[in-house]
């Protein structure tokens, strides 16, 4: 348990636990094989996305669906594809904001342009609900805002679409890639590359990280580095190593299992 706490409060997830996920893990060898093949075109990727959407809609045959909408590329793309495939489908767009002057104003305009209903959930004090949300996910997490749009979506439909995972699947963290490459040197070993990677996720830990734990948790950075070694101790290119770490890290151990726990709790 103490190791779980150490890892979660440093990486935002604990890669030592077993998770059940519909999203498969990837190994460096799989990426290497793909890189030696033919890259899919944007049209092929679009076709695959439409196929996934159609499969989900056909399986559930909903009268209405919910969509978690922000002003980001991922959820906007999802909305555009859904409306293009189903021009008459009743779509409820849901945004979560922590003040009335947030991005919800722009998200509403996007929703209206696609002829959908828009709902904004304003969370006045996110810290107030944190103990309750942590009791659901059973982990010391702070990034649990998705509960609010999942809860709201339950009022409209049992089928919810989100843009979660778009950055990990399609390389959306460009600001982090730029920083990683600026720190990267061809002679860096796996440990130095791991350090660079963590420096690009500085919002997940604090500069004096080793001081926030008591004596019961023997914190040292070497233990954290070893958890990520598999992603950087291989012959992939530097950005492919970052993609592998992002995909197998936050997507597999953070976004997917956290959302699944909320889905199960709320019956989505």
Summary of predicted features, one role per range:
Residues 2, 12, 160-162, 251-252, ...:
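Short hydrophobic-aromatic micro-motifs
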Residues 121, 245-247, 251-268:
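Short, intrinsically disordered, charge-balanced linker/junction segments flanking boundaries
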Residues 1-36, 40, 51-57, 146-147:
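N-terminal glutamine amidotransferase
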Residues 8, 133-134, 265-266:
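Short alpha-helical scaffolding segments that buttress acidic/His motifs in well-ordered protein cores
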Residues 35-242:
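ATP-dependent adenylate-handling active sites, centered on carboxylate activation for C-N bond formation
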